[in-house]
């Protein structure tokens, strides 16, 4: 049955609300930023890792959004004070529980990677404030010897985390639009895009790097391919719904009409994909590597990914099987 009334944020079939949408958005940023930072580190011979802003961004964006996302997830529980049960009592038939385990392993490897990168800074702090913790430096020394395989595993975990955000929604089998095999790949691509955009904002605003810096040139290599991939996956997503027939076709109609249709066409497609894509493909290099221009395009990219998360979550729950 098609909908003939506006239900932007309220529907009888709503199970997950805006908290989950923000949670998915934050995890995507974490996934993309960490993958980018590791790719940059392994592609360049860097003498002082802790002073490089792409590496710094990877550590910051890898950890902070994930911790904020987990906090949101905890307060989304019916009984938040029982969160420790979710953290340490795994249910292998629960996608959410498996996700929590993934986050814990991901954060463990991220911490190992981060302390190796900031080894000198940690040592200086220990010597100055807590000399009794000198044994920590021995542990970091051990971690330093295995940092290469740790990086490889962390990169894989970051990619799995990005795809997991799609698996989480596709597990809702009673919703035809969400029960879609394209979602994990789409969320991985869009999450990587948001991680790139967030990294750009940090290196240009906090790091005060120039728009034509080596770091900016490196990041630009990935922008267009990822956005084209994201656009292609969105097309595949909707084509699958269209030819799926039955409630899948109804779900497509409901999603692309009304309030959430506007969110998709304007927020996701125009602001989030077409404008950044055109800006990267057709403007001259002087504008393309302009600091303010990159910041503006990155903000558009983040808005688009944010809208995509809300669109998929809310529009996907408009129609049941």
Swiss-Prot record:
Transmembrane annotation, as ranges: 20-40, 58-78, 98-118, 153-173, 185-205, 224-244, 259-279, 293-313
Main location: membrane
InterPro entries the UniProt entry points to: Electron_transfer_protein (IPR052049), NrfD (IPR017566), NrfD-like (IPR005614)
Pfam families in alphabetical order: NrfD
Record membrane topology: Multi-pass membrane protein
Keyword Transmembrane helix: yes
GO cellular component, one term: plasma membrane
Subcellular location: Cell inner membrane
Record has DNA damage as a keyword: no
This protein's UniProt keywords: Cell inner membrane, Cell membrane, Membrane, Transmembrane, Transmembrane helix
Coiled coil: none
Functional description taken from the UniProt entry: Probably involved in the transfer of electrons from the quinone pool to the type-c cytochromes.
PANTHER family recorded: PROTEIN NRFD (PTHR34856:SF2)
Family assignment from sequence similarity: Belongs to the NrfD family.
The protein's name in its UniProt record: Protein NrfD homolog
Lineage: Bacteria, Pseudomonadati, Pseudomonadota, Gammaproteobacteria, Pasteurellales
Gene: nrfD
């Amino acid at each position: 049955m098609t909908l003939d009334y506006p239900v932007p944020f309220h529907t009888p079939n709503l199970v997950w609300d805006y908290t989950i949408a923000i949670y998915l958005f934050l995890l995507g940023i974490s996934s993309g930023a960490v993958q980018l930072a590791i790719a940059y580190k392994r592609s360049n011979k860097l003498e002082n890792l802790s002073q490089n802003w792409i590496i710094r961004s990877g550590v910051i964006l890898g950890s902070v959004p994930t911790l904020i996302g987990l906090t949101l997830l905890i307060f989304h529980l019916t009984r938040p004070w029982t969160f420790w049960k979710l953290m340490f009592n795994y249910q292998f038939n629960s996608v959410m529980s498996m996700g929590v385990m993934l986050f814990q392993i991901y954060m463990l490897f991220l911490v190992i990677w981060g302390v190796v990168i900031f080894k000198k800074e940690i040592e200086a702090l220990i010597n100055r404030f807590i000399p009794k913790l000198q044994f920590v430096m021995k542990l970091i020394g051990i971690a330093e010897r295995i940092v290469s395989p740790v990086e490889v595993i962390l990169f894989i975990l970051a990619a799995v985390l990005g795809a997991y955000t799609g698996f989480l929604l596709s597990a809702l089998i009673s919703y035809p639009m969400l029960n879609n095999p394209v979602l994990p790949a789409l969320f991985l691509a869009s999450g990587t895009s948001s991680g790139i955009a967030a990294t750009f904002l940090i290196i240009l605003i906090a790091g005060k790097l120039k728009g034509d810096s080596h770091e900016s040139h490196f990041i630009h290599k990935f922008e267009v391919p990822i956005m084209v991939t994201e656009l292609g996956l969105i097309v595949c997503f909707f084509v699958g719904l269209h030819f799926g027939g039955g409630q899948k076709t109804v779900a497509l109609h409901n999603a692309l009409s009304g309030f959430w249709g506007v969110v998709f066409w304007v927020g996701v497609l125009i602001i989030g994909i077409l404008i950044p894509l055109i800006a990267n493909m057709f403007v001259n290099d002087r504008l393309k590597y302009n600091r303010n221009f990159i910041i503006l395009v990155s903000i558009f990219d983040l808005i688009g990914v944010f809208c995509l998360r809300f669109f998929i979550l809310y529009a996907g729950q408009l129609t049941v099987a």
